Amino acid sequence: GEPAVRGAGEAEAPASWGRTSGKYREVGGPNSWLGWPKEPDSRGRDGGAWAQFENGYIYWHRVQGDAGPVTMRRDVFERWEREDYEYGPWGYPVSDERDIRIGGEIGQVQDFENGIAVRTPDDDVRLLHGGIAERFMGLGTADRNRLGFPAGDHSATNVPGYFTDFDNGVIYWSQANGTAVIYHGPIFDRYRELGFEGGRLGFLVEDEVINADGSRVAVFEYGTLRSDREGNVTEEDTGVDRKYDSLTDAQKEELGEVNDEGTTRESPDGTRGLYRDYKGGVVYWSAEHGGAVIFSTGVLNLYASTGYESGRYGFLVEDETVNADGSREAVFERGTITMDSDGNVTGSLED
């Protein structure tokens, strides 16, 4: 076939051949926003093809299906190339960009195999991936207007999962809980104070609900936050709270003051939950095992030396037993640690 372009004014321009040539003609050739070709057609991943022009690119791959080759503006390309082009997590572009109206402002969105690129009204290009991209595009008009344009890129959370910041909120994703939306406001502010998903509430698991009177509720892995219409936030008791409340006065006295609290790491059995570290011990809680307490003795010291719940013993599943002679025993998912009355500590793992 004939090449789409052979010359660019006085200078010779590379020819655009094959599948990209038809798309180039369709958008208007050198008189379009693409301008003149800069490089001949080149091969991409898995049999794809691309051509570079003065102001953008044309990409083709069979994943585009009936859409055929698509254009990409230079600013989107420059952000995408930082993620390793079509070889990276986003894969190939599968649509031309199109306008998207949010809250009275207009930006643009372009689809990729595994996400989207969004150009904001301020001309920032943001990449959204996977479930977060799908959720954003699936929001109704009112919810999307409330959330706004993306204000950040796809980012990893402190515990396994991802989030994207928006002008007025955040979309979270985790393997266990899928996607959920929280908006800026009193509940978001309290969640931030508590350490977001790494704090004692864990991941957001349901969309924040905003009622007609302005009150709000958000459900997390390990608790619920509620805000009245005046913005006063209350927190329902977590599993750690309930476990601590069930302890005897003597046990509470032995634990003493709180040092720290938050979500645990994952155990070898896949268990995650909450912990509250006291001066004299730790209270744990998980959905699988409920609440359990362990005190600051040689038993806890050995457990700590192996990596706590993420180590070879796994999660604490029962309260540490304290016998009349001073000996102690703690049972974990994958073994037991004991201390005799003389303070000698031994650990045994299940086969």
Descriptions of predicted regions:
Residues 1-351:
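Extended, compositionally biased repeat/scaffold regions that form elongated interaction surfaces
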